[in-house]
């Protein structure tokens, strides 16, 4: 089973059973020591796309929003290193829908919604994501660049993943400031089925 390391803010890392290492929205915290096989960037804001933080294995690939959302209304699936990545909607007033994506990952037999920066989307309202019966999903809830905790909780109910994780809880400018990587009060207020709270540095076996 894959292991997830939450690095803080919107950054996290997966290590699969075969050692494949995947970074999602690299920027914050620590844990960039393992060479990357795959780097996922949900959008090009500075706090999600520092792809030079980690060493890379030969053949490392970077999948960006445009790779799975190449045109309006078009979302597609790509595969790399045995991991399937499917683009889904991500947007709000600070994140244009045609520049941002969420990514549904399939790795080591589990499904995981890497939501990116977003508020409630039509993919959530329509039941499209609920129909996937996801194992895990993360939801940003800073209430400034993204939705607040109440809306994130509602989104979690609509998506219906077996486990939901609040992330991106504080507006950030310093990736090394622990106070900007996590907000315990917001995490506690997040209300979702199978809620899991991860602090920076925590690991989760999927």
Language model region names:
Residues 14, 43, 85, 117, ...:
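Divalent metal-coordination and catalytic microenvironments
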Residues 20, 57-63, 160-163, 191-193:
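A short helix->loop->beta-strand "cap" motif at the edges of active sites that frequently abuts
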Residues 46-50, 68-71, 172-178:
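Short, charged/polar "capping" segments at the starts of alpha-helices
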Residues 1-34, 38, 67-132, 147, ...:
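Core dinuclear metal-dependent hydrolase active-site scaffold
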Residues 28-67:
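Di-metal (Zn2+ and/or Mg2+/Mn2+) metal-binding site signature of metallo-dependent hydrolases
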Residues 1, 58-59, 81-83, 190-194:
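A short helix-to-beta-strand connector/capping loop
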Residues 122-203:
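Cap/insert and terminal regions of metallo-dependent hydrolase folds
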